[in-house]
């Protein structure tokens, strides 16, 4: 009985010891697990622990969870200077957003040595600016005025050229003698204004057509371009003058210095001159115009004859 009790005691004790070892081991094993969990948690806390920024030494940093491209080199971000850096990597100077900040150039202000020396330069600059603005404002108006002046200049040149051609001196041509026709015959003489009786054509001068005709030159220094027209016009004007006034003389303005120049008074009633020129009845041969000279077989049959 004692042995069983000892065995039981030993067994219980052993069991207790085993249980104690078991539970002790369990407890001890639980302590080892806690240590491992603690170590893992410490590692996680170390990752989340705020690090100093290597650029500005600020503790306002964070670990990048999603923006990590390489787990062996975790990425951190500094909220102060807004820069990223990686552990064991190169510090980037590019800010978030990729903005490129250019360094502002400091403007060196030139201290004026003397105010009096700078005043003339400033006034000259103001004058230059005013001249540039005035030239810029008037450039459009000058361009439009140039086009208008060019057109008016061309028109003026054409008018002056025509005037020069008209006023150019032609040998033997007299501008005041614009009323001369033919070989120096005056239109007033042809109308009978220069005669004593006034002439038959004295009233024709009041018509506007005659006044318009008087302003047209027909001759140049007493010489016509077409000699036949000149002769015809001269003969007709002489006949009109003699019909209007038989005693009127035809005056030649170009030869007024010679008193003997001019036609002598013609008298149709006198025996002077060829009377056969105007008396056609004396030279008509009645035998030539008789019926016997124009008779023919055809006319006899038809009964028609020429007078």
UniProtKB/Swiss-Prot annotation:
It holds the Pfam family Zn_ribbon_Dof. It is found in: Nucleus. GO terms for molecular function: DNA-binding transcription factor activity; transcription cis-regulatory region binding; zinc ion binding. Keywords: DNA-binding, Metal-binding, Nucleus, Transcription, Transcription regulation, Zinc, Zinc-finger. One of its GO terms (cellular component) is nucleus. Its main location: nucleus. PROSITE patterns: ZF_DOF_1, ZF_DOF_2. The lineage of its organism: Eukaryota, Viridiplantae, Streptophyta, Embryophyta, Tracheophyta. This is Dof zinc finger protein DOF5.4. It comes from Arabidopsis thaliana (Mouse-ear cress). Residues 109-123 have a biased composition (Polar residues). Transcription factor that binds specifically to a 5'-AA[AG]G-3' consensus core sequence. Enhances the DNA binding of OBF transcription factors to OCS elements. A zinc finger (Dof-type) spans 51-105. InterPro entries: Dof, Znf_Dof. Residues 96-147 are annotated as: Disordered. One of its GO terms (biological process) is regulation of DNA-templated transcription. Residues 124-133 have a biased composition (Basic and acidic residues). Residues 134-147 have a biased composition (Low complexity). Zn(2+) binds at residues 53, 56, 78, 81.
